[in-house]
C-alpha cells in the first residue's frame, strides 16, 4: 500500500511539472494574445537612514591654576641685649651706660615704627611710580601704534584714491567710447538674428506646406507614361523605376513604382515594406490618399530605381482595380532570404462609399491562401474569423472590422498596428508593425497581439517579414 501511494504521488508531480512547462511555451498558432501581468518586478530599494552624529560626554574643563602665594613671615627684630651692671648705682650715676640704653630702648620702638611707616610709604610711592611708568610706557606704545595705523591708513587711503581715480577714468572711457560701440554691435547682432528668425519662420512655413502632401523625391522621371505600368511596358518602358501614370484623363497623373522584371513585368506596386522606415499605423485619410516614399535613387544612377516604403492610397487602388479585371501578386521574404508568393487572379477594391470592400479569388502560390481561407493553424469558427475576403477597410479611427463588441477599445486596427481589411482579426497583416530580426513575442507588441508584418499561413503569428510587397496588373492572356 505504501508503494502504491508513492507511485501516485510521483505521477501527480510529473503531471504538474509537465503542465507548468507547457504553459511557459508560446503557442505560435494563436492569432491573438493577451498582455500578461509582469510578476517579476522587484520592489524599489528603500534608503537606509543615516546614523546620527556621535554624542555624549567629552573632556572636562581644565582646572584653574592656583597662585602659590607666599606668606609674609613677620620677622621680629631681637630685643637689644641687656645691659647689666654689677652695681645698680652705677647705672644711675652713668647715663651713658645702662640708663642710656634704657632711654634709647624707650625711643627705639617709636622710631622703628616711624621708619617702618616711611618704608611702607616709600614702597607704596615706588609701586605707584612703577605702575605710572608702566602706564606711560603703554600709552607711549599705543601712541606709536596709532601713529603707525594713521600712517598706514593714509597709505591705504592714497592707494584707494588712486584705484578709484583709475576706475573712474576707465568708466568714463567705457561709457564715452566702448558702450556706444557695443550698443551698435548688439543692434547689428539683433538685426541679424531677427533676419534669421524670419527666414526660419519662412522655411518652417514652406516645410509645413510641403508636408501636407505625400513625400516625394527628386528623380528624373521617364517620358513614357500610361494608364498603369502595364501600358507603360507596352510603350517601351522596360526599366523598374518610378513612373507617372494617369488612369483617368480627368484626374492628375501621379507617381508609382513599376516592377518591369517580375513575371514579365507591368506590375504597379501598391504597397511595399522593406526596412521599417515608414510608420503604417495611420488614420483613415492618409490611407485614403497614400503615404510614404514611392522610390529612391541609387548612388550611381540619376533615376529612382529602388522602391521605398509606401501605401499608394485606397482611392488610387480602387480606381486601378475597377478599370478592368486585375490580378494581385503578394511577395514576401523572411530574414533568412527565403521567398514565397501569393497570387490572386482576381482583385477588386470598391470605392470609399463602400468602405473600400475587397474581393479576391483564384489563388495560387507558395505562401498559403490567407486572404480567402484564413489562418491554416486555426480550425472552425476561429479560422473563419481570420478570412479577409469581403471585408471592409479599417483604421484605428474608422472601425469597420468584423469584431463586433460593445467595448470601443476592442478593434483590430488599433491592436494590430495598421490599416487593413481586418475581420476578427487577421491571417495576414502586411501593414503591421515592422520587427527587426523576424521573431517577436506578445510582450514586445504594444497590445500583446501579433501585430507584426505577418502572413500566418507561412510563418505563423509571431514572425514579422523582412520584405513584403503588393503589386497589381490588368489581367491579360499570357503567351
Curated annotation (Swiss-Prot):
Signal peptide segment: 1-18
Gene Ontology CC: one annotated term: platelet alpha granule
Site (Cleavage): 32-33
GO BP annotation list: adaptive immune response; blood coagulation, fibrin clot formation; cell-matrix adhesion; cellular response to interleukin-1; cellular response to leptin stimulus; fibrinolysis; induction of bacterial agglutination; innate immune response
One of the record's GO molecular function terms: signaling receptor binding
Keyword Transmembrane: no
Keyword Signal: yes
Family annotation (PROSITE patterns): FIBRINOGEN_C_1, FIBRINOGEN_C_2
Pfam families: Fib_alpha (PF08702), Fibrinogen_C (PF00147)
Comp. bias intervals (Basic and acidic residues): 35-45, 64-78
UniProt-annotated stretches for the region Beta-chain polymerization, binding distal domain of another fibrin: 33-35
Keywords, comma-separated and alphabetical: Adaptive immunity, Blood coagulation, Coiled coil, Disulfide bond, Glycoprotein, Hemostasis, Immunity, Innate immunity, Secreted, Signal
Glycosylation sites: 382
Cross-referenced InterPro entries: FIB_ANG-like, Fibrinogen-like_C, Fibrinogen_a/b/g_C_1, Fibrinogen_a/b/g_C_dom, Fibrinogen_a/b/g_coil_dom, Fibrinogen_CS
Modifications the protein undergoes after translation, according to the UniProt entry: Conversion of fibrinogen to fibrin is triggered by thrombin, which cleaves fibrinopeptides A and B from alpha and beta chains, and thus exposes the N-terminal polymerization sites responsible for the formation of the soft clot.
Protein name per Swiss-Prot or TrEMBL: Fibrinogen beta chain
Species the sequence originates in: Rattus norvegicus
Lineage of source species: Eukaryota, Metazoa, Chordata, Craniata, Vertebrata
Amino acid at each position: 500500500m505504501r508503494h502504491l501511494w508513492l507511485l501516485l504521488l510521483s505521477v501527480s508531480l510529473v503531471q504538474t511539472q509537465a503542465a507548468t512547462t507547457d504553459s511557459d511555451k508560446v503557442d505560435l498558432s494563436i492569432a491573438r494574445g493577451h498582455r500578461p501581468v509582469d510578476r517579476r518586478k522587484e520592489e524599489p530599494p528603500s534608503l537606509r537612514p543615516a546614523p546620527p552624529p556621535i554624542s555624549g560626554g567629552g573632556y572636562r574643563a581644565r582646572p584653574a591654576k592656583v597662585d602659590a602665594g607666599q606668606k609674609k613671615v613677620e620677622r621680629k627684630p631681637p630685643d637689644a641685649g641687656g645691659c647689666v651692671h654689677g652695681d645698680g648705682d652705677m647705672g644711675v650715676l652713668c647715663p651713658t651706660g645702662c640708663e642710656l640704653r634704657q632711654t634709647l630702648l624707650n625711643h627705639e620702638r617709636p622710631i622703628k615704627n616711624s621708619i617702618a611707616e616711611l618704608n611702607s610709604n616709600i614702597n607704596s610711592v615706588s609701586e605707584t611710580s612703577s605702575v605710572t611708568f608702566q602706564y606711560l610706557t603703554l600709552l607711549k606704545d599705543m601712541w606709536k601704534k596709532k601713529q603707525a595705523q594713521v600712517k598706514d591708513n593714509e597709505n591705504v587711503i592714497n592707494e584707494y584714491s588712486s584705484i578709484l581715480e583709475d576706475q573712474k577714468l576707465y568708466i568714463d572711457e567705457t561709457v564715452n567710447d566702448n558702450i556706444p560701440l557695443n550698443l551698435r554691435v548688439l543692434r547689428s547682432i539683433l538685426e541679424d538674428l531677427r533676419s534669421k528668425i524670419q527666414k526660419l519662420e519662412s522655411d518652417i512655413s514652406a516645410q509645413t506646406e510641403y508636408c501636407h502632401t505625400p513625400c516625394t523625391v527628386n528623380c528624373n522621371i521617364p517620358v513614357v507614361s500610361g494608364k498603369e505600368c502595364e501600358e507603360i511596358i507596352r510603350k517601351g518602358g522596360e526599366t523598374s523605376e518610378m513612373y507617372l501614370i494617369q488612369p483617368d484623363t480627368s484626374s492628375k497623373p501621379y507617381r508609382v513604382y513599376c516592377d518591369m522584371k517580375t513575371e514579365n513585368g507591368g506590375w504597379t506596386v501598391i504597397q511595399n515594406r522593406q526596412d521599417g522606415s515608414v510608420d503604417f499605423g495611420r488614420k483613415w485619410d492618409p490611407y485614403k490618399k497614400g503615404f510614404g516614399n514611392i522610390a529612391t535613387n541609387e548612388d550611381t544612377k540619376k533615376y529612382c530605381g529602388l522602391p521605398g516604403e509606401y501605401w499608394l492610397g485606397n482611392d488610387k487602388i480602387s480606381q486601378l482595380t475597377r478599370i478592368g479585371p486585375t490580378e494581385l501578386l503578394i511577395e514576401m521574404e523572411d530574414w533568412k532570404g527565403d521567398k514565397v508568393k501569393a497570387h490572386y487572379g482576381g482583385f477588386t477594391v470598391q470605392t470609399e462609399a463602400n468602405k473600400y470592400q475587397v474581393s479576391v479569388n483564384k489563388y495560387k502560390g507558395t505562401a498559403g491562401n490567407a486572404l480567402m481561407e484564413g489562418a491554416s493553424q486555426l480550425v472552425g469558427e476561429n479560422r473563419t474569423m481570420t478570412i479577409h475576403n469581403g471585408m471592409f477597410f479599417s483604421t484605428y479611427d474608422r472601425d469597420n472590422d468584423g469584431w463586433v463588441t460593445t467595448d470601443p477599445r476592442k478593434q483590430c486596427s488599433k491592436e494590430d498596428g495598421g490599416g487593413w481589411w481586418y475581420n476578427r482579426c487577421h491571417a495576414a497583416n502586411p501593414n503591421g508593425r515592422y520587427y527587426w530580426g523576424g521573431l517577436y513575442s506578445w510582450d514586445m507588441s504594444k497590445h500583446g497581439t501579433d501585430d507584426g508584418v505577418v502572413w500566418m499561413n507561412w510563418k505563423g503569428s509571431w514572425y514579422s517579414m523582412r520584405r513584403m510587397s503588393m503589386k497589381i496588373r490588368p489581367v491579360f492572356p499570357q503567351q
